[in-house]
Swiss-Prot record:
Reported consequences of knocking out the gene: Embryonically lethal. Embryos suffer loss of nuclear structure and of a continuous nuclear membrane. baf-1 is delocalized to the chromatin. At permissive temperature (15 degrees Celsius) about 30% of the embryos die, and the survivors appear normal.
Primary role: DNA-binding protein which plays an essential role in nuclear envelope formation. Required for normal chromosome segregation during mitosis. Associates with the nuclear lamina via its interaction with LEM domain containing proteins emr-1 and lem-2. In association with lem-3, plays a role in radiation-induced DNA damage repair response.
Keywords: DNA damage, DNA repair, DNA-binding, Nucleus, Phosphoprotein
Gene Ontology cellular-component annotations: condensed chromosome; condensed chromosome, centromeric region; cytoplasm; nuclear envelope; nucleoplasm; nucleus
Predominant location category: nucleus
PTM entry text: Phosphorylated by vrk-1. Phosphorylation by vrk-1 in mitosis is essential to achieve correct timing of recruitment of nuclear envelope components during nuclear envelope assembly. Dephosphorylated by protein phosphatase 2A (PP2A) following interaction with lem-4l during mitotic exit, leading to mitotic nuclear envelope reassembly.
Native organism taxonomy: Eukaryota, Metazoa, Ecdysozoa, Nematoda, Chromadorea
Gene name tied to this protein: baf-1
Subunit-structure text: Interacts with emr-1 and lem-2. Interacts with lem-4l, leading to decreased phosphorylation by VRK1 and promoting dephosphorylation by protein phosphatase 2A (PP2A).
Highest rank taxon of the organism: Eukaryota
Gene3D superfamilies named among the record's database cross-references: Barrier-to-autointegration factor, BAF (1.10.150.40)
SUPFAM superfamilies: Barrier-to-autointegration factor, BAF (SSF47798)
The protein's name: Barrier-to-autointegration factor 1
Location in or out of the cell: Nucleus
InterPro entries: BAF, BAF_prot, BAF_sf
Amino acid sequence: MSTSVKHREFVGEPMGDKEVTCIAGIGPTYGTKLTDAGFDKAYVLFGQYLLLKKDEDLFIEWLKETAGVTANHAKTAFNCLNEWADQFM
């Protein structure tokens, strides 16, 4: 699977205090919607990923319902967080 530069940059280092828009698949529009819903930082969205027990289908559905994220972008975000978890947890 080919990944974007944004994906590689995110998974290549600790998350720290990065904005939610640093996650691959989450651009400015989705970032604003997520921020409005209380998910302004990457670690907050990562927390939701963990609360949903790293379940791909649940996380994608949640992103679609919460911020109107398309299935493709939601899968990209899931893959980004999932790979980060594999490397740092």
